[in-house]
Each structure stands twice: as C-alpha cells, then as structure tokens.
Design a protein with these regions (language model features):
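Aromatic- and glycine-rich beta-strand/loop motifs that create alpha-glucan
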Residues: 1-23
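A structural motif at transmembrane helix-loop-helix junctions in multipass membrane proteins
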Residues: 165-199, 203
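Long, hydrophobic alpha-helical segments
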Residues: 71-96
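Terminal transmembrane helical anchor/hairpin motif
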Residues: 11-14, 28-68, 189-262
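Hydrophobic/aromatic residues in alpha-helical transmembrane segments
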Residues: 84-91, 103, 139, 173-174, ...
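Transmembrane helix boundary and interhelical loop/hinge segments in multi-pass membrane proteins
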Residues: 88-108, 122
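Secretory targeting signals
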Residues: 23, 27, 31, 72-75, ...
C-alpha cells in the first residue's frame, strides 16, 4: 500500500495534466455539438464519398447527423489516442525510472520483496488510468446533459468509455511488462506502442488481407461504429487482448525478480 501511495503521489502532476487536457478537449467537443449539428448531415455525405479514408478511421458506418455518431469519432480521436499515449508513458516509466534516477538500490534495501515493489507500481499505474477515465467520463456526461442530449446517455455511450478504459489498461500493462527489461529511457518506447497500435488499426481497416491485425491492436475493440450499432463490445478481440496483457505482465514479473539491478 505504501508503494502504491508513493508512486501515485510521485506521478500526480503527470496525471493531473493529462486528465485536464483530455477532459478539456473532449468536453469542448461535446459543448460545440449544437453549433456543429446543422452541418453534420453534409459531413456524413462528404465522408461517404471519400472511400478508403473514411474506412480507415471507421467513419464510413457512422451517422454524423446523430450525436452518438459524432461523439464516437471525436472520442476515438481524443480519448482513444490521447489515453493510449498516457497509458504507454505511464506503464513504460513505472519500473525503469528507478534505475534511470538511480533510486532502485535504495528502494530494494527496504524490507519488501521485488514482487511487492512490482505489484505496488502496477497498482499505481492502474489507479492513475482509472482516475483519468472516471474524470473524463464525468466531464462528458455533464456536457451531454448541458447541451440537452440526455437521450444519448445510453449503453453505447458508456460502453465507449469502457472500451477505451480497457484499451488503456492493455497498453499500460504491455508497456509495464516491457519496462522490466529496460535500464533507462523508455518514453519513446511507450509512445511507439501507443502510436503503433493506432496505426495498425488504421491499416487493418484498409484491406481485408490486413484484418488479422485487429487481433493485435486494442483499438479494434474500440470501433465506435460497432459499439454504437450493436450496443456491445467485440468480445473476441478483448479476449485476445487480455491474453497479450497477461503474457506481458507475467514476463515482466518473472524478469524483474531476477534482474541484476546496479
């Protein structure tokens, strides 16, 4: 518990900044919808004529004339990519920063096992992601009520947030596992994982031959068009993502317990 609290306090400014920026951007996106609504049908027609471009971003199956169609795309742009980058950075720096800042030896001299250290740091990462998503969801919910779109507060609305929460957990856990193998740096790796998964999803939407990539990227189960239409999450992709998460965490725990830290 002490490690959890210490790590969370240590990362409070990063959490505050990321939460504030994502909440502000997505909140503004919601609040300007009434001004954008008259042009949304024209945008739907425009995107319909753009072929593979709209398919790549999953916009070919959404109706921008409805709030949920608009919000699903904007949520993916802001919370999807922004949250993925936050999760990647938070996960990758969790373990490596001790060696980078030369505090690892001091930390490990305390009467706690390496397993307890890793568990505490992992719980801190998960707690930070949970806080960010709860705040963002709260801000967006208040924004939807403020613009008079209460009818949009359906299962699909909250499932979008659940999907991106799971995405961030998966990316954070994968980068957390990777961080056990690193001695310094890591931020570029965390950003690379976030961007990499994002572009893999775009590629998987372009051709049928690339659809297999959907089983690799967590963005596959965050497709707004699928969630809005079916009011459900794509369980097969989530299951595969859970398996990748477990493998990364097990590998990270196993290696860090045996790692030569000097």
């Amino acid at each position: 518990m002490k490690i959890l609290l210490h790590e969370t306090k240590r990362s409070r400014w990063s959490l505050l900044i990321w939460t504030a920026v994502i909440s502000f951007m997505l909140g503004i996106t919601v609040l300007i919808y009434p001004e954008m609504a008259p042009q949304m049908n024209e945008m739907t027609d425009m995107f319909a004529d753009m072929g593979s471009f709209t398919a790549a971003f999953g916009m070919d199956q959404l109706n921008f004339g409805e709030f949920m169609g608009y919000f699903a795309v904007e949520c993916g742009n802001v919370l999807g990519l922004g949250g993925a980058l936050f999760a990647g950075i938070t996960g990758i720096t969790a373990l490596v920063k001790e060696e980078r800042d030369r505090t690892a030896e001091f930390l490990l001299t305390h009467p706690v096992s390496r397993t307890e250290v890793v568990k505490g740091k992992l719980l801190s990462v998960l707690a930070q992601i949970s806080v960010l998503n709860l705040v963002v969801m709260g801000v967006c919910t208040l924004g939807v009520v403020a613009i008079g779109e209460k009818a949009a507060l359906t299962a699909a609305f909250f499932l979008l947030f659940l999907a991106y929460y799971l995405l961030q957990l998966e990316i954070a856990c994968i980068t957390f596992g990777i961080s056990a193998f690193l001695k310094k740096g890591g931020v570029a790796v965390g950003l690379g994982v976030g961007f990499g998964f994002y572009f893999l999803n775009i590629l998987s939407n372009l051709t049928e031959e690339a659809e297999v990539l959907k089983y690799i990227t967590p963005f596959a189960y965050c497709e707004g068009s699928y969630i809005v239409e079916n009011k459900a999450l794509d369980i097969p992709y989530i299951t595969v993502g859970g398996g990748l998460t477990a493998i990364a965490l097990i590998a990270g725990f196993w290696y860090y317990r045996r790692k030569d830290i000097s």
